[in-house]
Swiss-Prot record:
Reactions that this protein is recorded to catalyse: L-ribulose 5-phosphate = L-xylulose 5-phosphate
Name of the coding gene: ulaE
Pathway(s): Cofactor degradation; L-ascorbate degradation; D-xylulose 5-phosphate from L-ascorbate: step 3/4
Protein origin, superkingdom: Bacteria
GO molecular function list: intramolecular oxidoreductase activity, interconverting aldoses and ketoses; L-ribulose-5-phosphate 3-epimerase activity
Similarity annotation: Belongs to the L-ribulose-5-phosphate 3-epimerase family.
EC top class, as a word: isomerase
Gene Ontology biological process terms, A to Z: L-ascorbic acid catabolic process
Induction note: Induced by L-ascorbate. Repressed by UlaR.
Keywords: Isomerase
Protein name: Putative L-ribulose-5-phosphate 3-epimerase UlaE
Gene3D superfamilies, per database record: Divalent-metal-dependent TIM barrel enzymes (3.20.20.150)
């Protein structure tokens, strides 16, 4: 029987670095999490996961079965290095190949959702052509995802092109495909001049997961919980009242901390307390 608990997960980069997924999932279970979100970023080390052998993929699946801790989502930030909007055809082709491999990987190991980074380009100057290429790249990507039955979910970003749910909804309407949805980050959403609660309500019916972190205007990473501008209780209340029942993911970058597990446990307790205050009694 499926649990009625609110699924609460932790980002891979919050936990100690390494490639042993059995150890990582066991630690996540000990810390009280339901799932771990995998990172495939722009480093060669994490990009190489997309070329894992059959045996390596099976080892991940076996670790999931053994621990009972799922890996239902992938944060695919590799497109910062190989953007779909690049005006360099070779770079853009690499970006599309990364997407193809990520979708195949997800299909093989049971990942249901791939979070996309909403950058047309990251290290280059953006223009109308980079945005057009980005849109076309998303269209190709969603066609691949549809065939594989893997959801692509756009993150609300630290970048003007995709810094609100309203903007991301424009792409959802343009693509008009059930395999393209939204993955808001309430930290990023709050760091911009957005009506956060209205934005969350506007996204209902398209939100498949939520990133939980604190931010300040212009500071999108490593802001300790409670020291930023995010009104967590109101965000949780709005999502609950709007009918959202999906997963929440605590996003942290504590893998290089002196004691990552202690940092994560502290953050989990802090977030769960705010969830309880917001009336999400299942999370108390």
């Amino acid at each position: 029987m499926l649990s009625k608990q609110i699924p609460l997960g932790i980002y891979e980069k919050a936990l100690p670095a390494g490639e042993c997924w059995l150890e990582r999932l066991q630690l996540a279970k000990t810390l009280g999490f339901d799932f771990v979100e995998m990172s495939v970023d722009e480093t060669d080390e994490r990009l190489s996961r997309l070329d894992w052998s059959r045996e390596q993929r099976l080892a991940l699946v076996n670790a999931i079965v053994e621990t009972g801790v799922r890996v239902p989502s992938m944060c695919l930030s590799a497109h910062r290095r190989f953007p779909l909007g690049s005006e360099d055809d070779a770079v853009r082709a690499q970006g599309l190949e990364i997407m193809r491999k990520a979708i195949q990987f997800a299909q093989d190991v049971g990942i249901r959702g791939i979070q996309l980074a909403g950058y047309d380009v990251y290290y280059q100057e953006a223009n109308n052509e980079t945005r057009r290429r980005f849109r076309d790249g998303l269209k190709e990507s969603v066609e691949m995802a549809s065939r594989a039955q893997v959801t692509l979910a756009m993150e609300i970003m630290d970048y003007p092109l995709m810094n609100s749910i309203s903007k991301a909804l424009g792409y959802a309407h343009y693509l008009n495909n059930p395999w393209f949805q939204l993955y808001p980050d309430i930290g990023n959403l709050s760091a911009w001049d957005n009506d956060v609660q209205m934005e969350l309500q506007a996204g209902m019916g398209h939100i498949v997961a939520v990133h939980v972190k604190d931010t300040k205007p212009g500071v999108f990473k490593n802001v300790p919980f409670g020291e930023g501008v995010v009104d967590f209780e109101r965000c949780f209340e709005t999502l609950k009242q709007s009918g959202y029942c999906g997963p929440y993911l605590i996003e942290m970058w504590s893998e290089t901390a002196e004691d990552p597990a202690a940092e994560v446990a502290k953050a989990r307790d802090w977030v769960k307390a705010r969830m309880a205050k917001a009336g999400m009694v299942e999370a108390a």
